[in-house]
């Protein structure tokens, strides 16, 4: 029998429709040194209904089509984030900041996979801003605490490409910003 060797890799094309995102918020100063804010962010995750991959190497494309992994259904739903923040001005050159937001998972367990994880996050952030003449320095740290999600391996699979397992995610995001006023 002839043996066919599968190429070690293949270039690919992937079609992804990114969602519409709309946000709005309000802020006010209950006292001169304290700024409080609240935002609402709506994301149309339902636009990201599936991800289609086309492998340019024909052997890979055939293999992936046969396994039904060329199309990954996501079945994501629209989601709304709620965000709250505070900035306290210590003096004319220093501000302290803190925030919190809740970001619900847009995807169901039936389509959960490691390529596009979907977790509900509770995020907290802290920061400090320092003004030196016309130079503004800002430092921040954000910690996203993702919930743990367990996807089972249904027979038959609800969605090709779903990956059974328990997934958790925590993200730490440091930020630095330097700006200058002319």
Question: Where do the protein language model's features map onto the residues?
Answer:
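Outer-membrane beta-barrel porins/channels
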Residues: 1-182
């Amino acid at each position: 029998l002839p043996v066919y060797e599968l190429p070690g890799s293949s270039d690919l094309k992937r079609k992804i429709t990114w969602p519409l995102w709309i946000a709005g918020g309000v802020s006010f100063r209950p006292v001169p040194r304290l700024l409080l804010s609240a935002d609402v962010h709506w994301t149309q995750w339902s636009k990201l209904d599936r991800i289609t991959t086309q492998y340019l190497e024909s052997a890979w494309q055939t293999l992936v089509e046969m396994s039904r992994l060329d199309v990954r259904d996501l079945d994501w739903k629209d989601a709304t984030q709620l965000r709250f923040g505070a900035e306290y001005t210590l003096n004319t050159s220093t501000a302290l900041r803190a925030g919190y937001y809740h970001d619900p998972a847009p995807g169901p367990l039936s389509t959960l996979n490691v390529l596009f994880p979907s977790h509900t996050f509770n995020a907290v952030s802290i920061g400090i801003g320092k003004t030196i003449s016309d130079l503004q320095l800002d430092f921040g740290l954000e910690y996203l605490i993702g919930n743990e999600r367990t996807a089972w391996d249904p027979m038959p699979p609800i969605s090709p490409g779903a990956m059974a397992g328990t997934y958790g995610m925590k993200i730490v995001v440091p930020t630095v910003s330097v700006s200058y006023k002319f």
